[in-house]
Amino acid sequence: PERAIAYSNKKVVSDEIVDAFTIGEARSFEADPRFGFIVLAEIASRALSPSVNDHGTAINTISSITRLMLLWHNPKSETETENSQSDSAQHEEFKYDRISLPALNVNDLFDDAYTSIARDGAANIEVAIRIQKSLKTIKACFKDGGTSIERDFVEAASKLAKQSYERAKLALDYEDDIKRIERVYNDN
C-alpha cells in the first residue's frame, strides 16, 4: 500500500499513469496466472472432501491443470521461433523497453496447482495415479527444452511427483494400491 507502482521522469498527467493499472480487491485470471491454478486446486480439494466425495471431479481438474501447464510448452520450428523472436524482440524493444515484471516462480505455480490435491487425495489411488501421470506428461513435454523455464518445469514436476508419491504411500492402506503407485512413480 505504501509503495509506488509506477514512476515517471517526464511530466505526465497522473490520470494516464493511473489508467494503465488495474487495482482491485479481488484477483483475476487475466492478471494472475497462478490464481487460476489456485481455483482449480480448490475445486479438486473440495471434491475430495468427505462431504462431497467426488473423485471424478478431482481427476478431471487434474487433467485441466495438465492442459494449462502444457500451454507454456509451444513447440515451433526453428524458423518460426527465430522469426517470432526477432519480430517480438524488435516490437518489444520499441514499445515496452521500460516495463519490468517479476519472473514467474515455477515452484510456486506447481505448489498452487498440485500440493493441496496431493494432500487431500493421497488416500485415493485413482487421484494419486492421475497426479503422477499429469506430472509425467509435463516432464516429458519439457524435458528437451533448452530454456530455463522449461528446466524449471521439469524440476518442479519431479519434486511434486516425489512428494505426491510419498504422501500416497503413507496414506494408502491396501498393499496392492501401494505397489501400483510405486510402479507409476518409478515409471517416471
Feature names for model-found ranges:
Residues 1-3:
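Membrane-embedded segments
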Residues 5, 9-188:
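Short basic (Lys/Arg) and small-residue
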